[in-house]
Amino acid sequence: MPGSPARPNFLVIVADDLGFSDLGAFGGEIATPNLDALALEGLRLTDFHVAPTCSPTRSMLLTGTDHHIAGIGSMAEAIAPEQIGQPGYEGYLNERVVALPELLREAGYQTLMAGKWHLGLTPELAPHARGFERSFSLLPGAANHYGFEPPYDESTPGILKSTPALYIEDDQFVEQLPEGFYSSDAFGDRLIQYLKERDQARPFFAYLPFSAPHWPLQAPAEVVAKYRGHYDAGPEALRQERLQRLKQLGLVAEDVQAHPVLALTQEWERLTPQQRAISARTMEVYAAMVERMDWNIGRVVDYLRRQGQLDNTFVIFLSDNGAEGALLEAFPKFGPNLQSFLDQHYDNSLDNIGNANSYVWYGPRWAQAATAPSRLFKAFTTQGGIRVPALLRYPELRRQQGQIDHSFATVMDITPTILDLAGVRHPGSRWRGREVAPLRGKSWLGWLSGETGAPHDEHHVTGWELFGMRAVRKGPWKAVYIPAPLGPESWQLYDLSKDPGEIHDLAKHEPAKLAALIEHWHEYAEETGVVLGRSPFQPD
């Protein structure tokens, strides 16, 4: 970039299942001073979109194209029979794409990673095989944050078998995690170590994808204690408090209507005192996980500041999907004996929740406190599943601090933006003798520098599909298809400029608009190779 003393560094930070309003800078009450500071020195994006779940988003982030092309057409843990063996449904980052770290390393960047991978479970599919010079990563989609695992046998539920504490450093599996291991601390430690050991003459690309605050909800007891009693009024009270702060901060419109809560669980008022206490404790632990993640982000940022590198580092933070509202015990894929197995091998008593030998999640009502005013949560193609908090800091591009931008953007834009800033050209359709997918995302460089408007105009079309859930957007108009029981199993139509909560279905009032959008979705599905199949996660 003209006038820059050196090629910029990059720090890409991903939270796992973070809700839209969890951060202080996005209306939350959780202590996140480090991310809040980045937001106040940079730019907050209020209409940033991802895939409905984790591994699809990660594949899009690192390739700039759609997850159906990149090999994660469905999550490997949830592939439908119709999808097995189909192109784009390999369950790992395939060879039809070139990964961002591969291109940056080829261009002289030092590529570093510490965090969750979820794009392949074997050494030949691990981060070091896709361009990272140094990497310490959790390979599966989740794991006990302390590395605790009871003995597994044929009775172990599928969800636990698919989420072992399987870590790899470069090309070697980690046989024994150190005493006192905690995922977020370990990722912060390792990335700082790699930054200290790096070749100072080369710019760096650092990828820091946390596995927090994904279930199982676990955090250091001293951090959990800070939130004792904070959530005793229940999720609906929290939802209203956060909505009010979102309005005060200018992140949503003053007159926004929030979508009603949709949940297969009892309302707070109908719970027993013990049930309320346990539910509130899970939220306390969740909050502590978010705070601890922020603390580790602060350690990395402080290191870069002390080294004089922060202002030459493009920092971007995002969540990989909406807040997690699933009731794990309701899904047959996770194993019909999940609850009995947890009762046998874990201690989920009130005083033990959050410790290494506990295993809990917080459910749909707390999730919808975090996704409001949007509809539903993770795994859905409604706004609650795909619209997430995102912020960036890079003084070279944004001179005004604390800005908020309501332009539409997508996770596929990150790779072309970073390549543009680094002065690296994407190879297009061929790389190292093989065909690769071109970019679908758009660079933000002109937009962020103020030279052009938003990267996606009102004619741009973006499609989504996962687990049979579908959506397509063109300008403010969005069509969405959600199967039963939490959707009508038919296409719905919304004008997000007037109805961001997806409350007022205009399908019957604007049939031509809906038909055009459905046609756009079919074009998207054909371009990307969508294969529809029933979701194994759908409740019986």
What are these regions (language model features)?
Residues M1-L43, P52, E106, W117, ...:
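Active-site-proximal N-terminal segment of extracellular/periplasmic enzymes that hydrolyze or transfer
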Residues M1-P8, A15, G19-F20, R44, ...:
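Long, internal low-complexity/basic segments
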Residues S21-G27, V50, T57-M60, A70-M75, ...:
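Short, solvent-exposed loop/turn and secondary-structure capping segments
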Residues L23-G24, Q86-N94, V174-Y182, Y231-A233, ...:
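Active-site rim elements
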Residues G28-M60, G64-I69, G108-L112, R130-L139, ...:
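Short, structured active-site-proximal loop/turn typified by the sulfatase FGly-forming signature C/S-X-P-X-R
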Residues G73-E106, H118-V224, R228, A233, ...:
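Formylglycine-dependent
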Residues T122-G131, Q218-A219, D302-R393:
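Histidine-centered active-site microenvironments of extracellular/periplasmic hydrolases
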Residues E133-Y146, N355-I386, R398-K498, E527, ...:
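C-terminal cap/loop subdomain of S1 sulfatases and analogous C-terminal strand-loop tails that border
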